[in-house]
Structure formats: C-alpha cells, structure tokens
Amino acid sequence: MELQHHIKCKPGDLGRSVLLPGDLERAKLISTFMDRPRHVASSREFNTYTGEFQDVPVSVISTGVGAPSASIVVEEAIKVGARNMIRVGTCGALQPNVHPGDLIIATAAVRGDGTTPEYIDMSYPAVADFHLVRALVDAADELGASYHLGVIRTHDAFYME
C-alpha cells in the first residue's frame, strides 16, 4: 500500500483507533494527551499525530470542516489500517438541558448532508455501533463527564437549523 494522497500516511503510520477533530490545532492539542506522540504528516487541513494511550497505539487526524473532507480522511485512513474512528469537536444543540462542554454520544444520525448518499442509500439508517457507544458511555461515566445520548442530525450548512 502506498502513501495516501491527502493525509500523507502509509501502513504503520496510524493506530487502529483514530480521533477525528475538524481543527488542526485541536489535533495537536489531543496529541498532548498521548504517550510518545509523534507528528506523522501535515497536508492541507489534514494534520496527523500518532502515539499511545494506555499502551494502545492511537492516532488523531484533523479533517477540516464538513463531511466531504472528513470522508477523504476516513477512506484514506482505512486504506492504511485504521478501523475505529470517532469524530470529536463542534456540535450544536436545541435542547436547553445541553450545555457547553457536555459530551454528545450519537446513537444514530439523521443524514441531511450531501456526502453520505454517495456511500449508501438515504433509506438505510445511520446507526452507531452498539459496542462503541457502550465504550463511550462507560468512559464518560468513569470520568464523571456530563453527556447526552441520542440521535443527531448532520447537514452541510453550519449555521442553519
């Protein structure tokens, strides 16, 4: 497998688990929580770090804003060995009980974006992996973090409801 065109990674550069923030600086910040972090690559909005967390190889790659650039990262990361990916970063909420800093753990998504229909028909439900959701809930409980579980909505217009 060759070097990936956009993320500039090759097999062995990434852990099986990858965090996907939109912002390059957030990727750098996340890497500071890793043991032995190393900067793997930078290309356009894609900034990649790999290290270890609790002796497990993990990576973080910034995706830029939106589903189209995130899909580039996901496709190329899979080609070089990533298997578990979690999008982290900005979201909004309409419920008054959701506060800044609360975690949102998506159990499913209403797809209102233009990218996901390129992968699968809109009639197919976008439901999160149960085991991954359970692991996120367990971790949030262990940390004492405030979190909310539920169905999210994704779409292309950042400031539109």
Identify the residue ranges that each predicted region occupies.
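Metabolite-binding pocket within alpha/beta catalytic cores that recognizes anionic/polar moieties
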Residues: 1-134
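Active-site rim beta-loop-alpha module in soluble metabolic enzymes
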Residues: 126-161
